[in-house]
Amino acid sequence: MAGNDSNLIWLDLEMTGLEPVEDVILEIAIIITDSELNILAQGPIFAISQTDDVLDNMNPWCIEHHGKSGLTQRCRDSEVSLAHATKESLAFVQEWVPQGKSPMCGNSIGQDRRFINKYMPDFEDHFHYRNLDVSTIKELAKRWKPEVLESVVKTGAHLALDDIKESIAELKVYRELFFKL
């Protein structure tokens, strides 16, 4: 096992909704950064194959946004199973970070973790139990220093890789303007 104990694993999922009991994963993307938030590697991006029934019965928000982004069609066309995405995602992070060292990093990452825990438990086992959740800092900035939020740029693409890059950039803004580091 290679990797650095201080590297961070960033990920984002797109799902058919917000409830892991009834919804499923549509897309996963991963980025590895060092502790200073410099991107070291972009991992695999998988659109998970889903049936028409699953895609046609997403909640209205997902039907609209995943339709606009092209993700729905990518899932219809995909031949990638969740098992394959899990195996390849785990292999990728194992190259960069030893098991149990990186928190799960991202925006509202607790939500993603619920889905990973249910659908990708072998992958979830690679992470430290802690989360690095950028949305927590956003909530603090909103209350304690709202002017910082003006410097955060969001495109709202709702594609996993774009969302990760935005989360990393957002944390850099908070580091500079909120924490003043």
UniProtKB/Swiss-Prot annotation:
Annotated EC: 3.1.15.-
GO molecular function: 3'-5'-RNA exonuclease activity; nucleic acid binding
Major location category of this protein: cytoplasm
Keyword RNA-binding applies: no
Domain of life: Bacteria
Keyword field: Cytoplasm, Exonuclease, Hydrolase, Nuclease
Any GO CC annotation of this UniProt entry: cytoplasm
GO biological-process terms attached to the record: DNA metabolic process
Active site: Y129
Localization, UniProt: Cytoplasm
Enzyme class name: hydrolase
Keyword hit for Iron: no
Matches recorded under InterPro entries: Exonuclease_RNaseT/DNA_pol3, Oligoribonuclease, RNaseH-like_sf, RNaseH_sf
Similarity annotation: Belongs to the oligoribonuclease family.
NCBIfam families associated with the record: PRK05359.1
PANTHER family for the chain: OLIGORIBONUCLEASE, MITOCHONDRIAL
Function text: 3'-to-5' exoribonuclease specific for small oligoribonucleotides.
Protein name: Oligoribonuclease
Organism of this sequence: Colwellia psychrerythraea (strain 34H / ATCC BAA-681) (Vibrio psychroerythus)
